[in-house]
Swiss-Prot record:
Stretch list, region Disordered: 171-203
Lipid-linked residues (S-palmitoyl cysteine): C26, C29
Bilayer topology annotation: Single-pass type III membrane protein
Organism expressing this protein natively: Mus musculus (Mouse)
Keyword presence, Cell membrane: yes
Keywords annotated in UniProt: Adaptive immunity, Cell membrane, Immunity, Lipoprotein, Mast cell degranulation, Membrane, Palmitate, Phosphoprotein, Signal-anchor, Transmembrane, Transmembrane helix
Protein name: Linker for activation of T-cells family member 2
Pfam family, one: LAT2
Disulphides: none
Gene Ontology terms, MF aspect: SH2 domain binding
Length: 203
């Protein structure tokens, strides 16, 4: 065991040194990288500032050299156009709020432009009330079959799909001798009694 312990101490010390060296390299390498990026960023900003100030100086020098009438009026026209668009609401309420804008020298409206919905679309007037004679929207009873004249005061059920079943039921009631009401309506007949259940209870 002592031989194993003797080998374990130097190996663990070597691993510890290797780990420390790796950590030191990581810390050391990461710092200059950040500093380098910051330096590059600062250099870029300085170059951009120098270019923009040089452009401003040449522009001001160019304006001072030619004090006569302005030769290129395109920037001024675009500036006037922007002002016109921004302050078009000050012209008056009669002027339209939306306009078709034209591209360049085409003098044709842009194909992608869609005219806005007119304001009277939302300001509907009052609906006119239909005349009293017009009953096209009213409901009415519709018969499936043509009406037939009732025979001897008995209501006819020809209009229903199950009229054959109703006739058979009436005939069965007549043959059994059950009293029919004068009107023949099912509402005035006695309640249904389950005869089979009553017969089974008596047994």
């Amino acid at each position: 065991m002592s031989a194993e312990l003797e080998l374990l101490w130097p190996v663990s010390g070597l691993l510890l040194l290797l780990l420390g060296a790796t950590a030191w390299l990581c810390v050391h390498c990461s710092r200059p990288g950040v500093k380098r990026n910051e330096k590059i960023y600062e250099q870029r900003n300085r170059q951009e500032n120098a270019q923009s100030s040089a452009a401003a100086q040449t522009y001001s020098l160019a304006r001072q050299v030619w004090p006569g009438p302005q030769m290129d009026t395109a920037p001024n026209k675009s500036f006037e156009r922007k002002n016109k668009m921004l302050f078009s609401h000050l012209e008056g309420p009669e002027s339209p709020r939306y306009q078709n804008f034209y591209k360049g020298s085409n003098q044709e409206p842009d194909a992608a432009y869609v005219d806005p919905i007119p304001t009277n679309y939302y300001n509907w007037g009052c609906f006119q009330k239909p005349s009293e004679d017009d009953d096209s929207n009213s409901y009415e009873n519709v018969l499936v079959c043509k009406p037939s004249t009732p025979e001897s005061g008995v209501e006819d059920f020809e209009d229903y799909q199950n009229s054959v079943s109703i006739h058979q039921w009436r005939e069965s009631k007549r043959t059994m001798g059950a009293p029919m009401s004068l009107s023949g309506s099912p509402d005035e007949e006695p309640d249904y009694v389950n005869g089979d259940v009553a017969a089974a209870e008596n047994i």
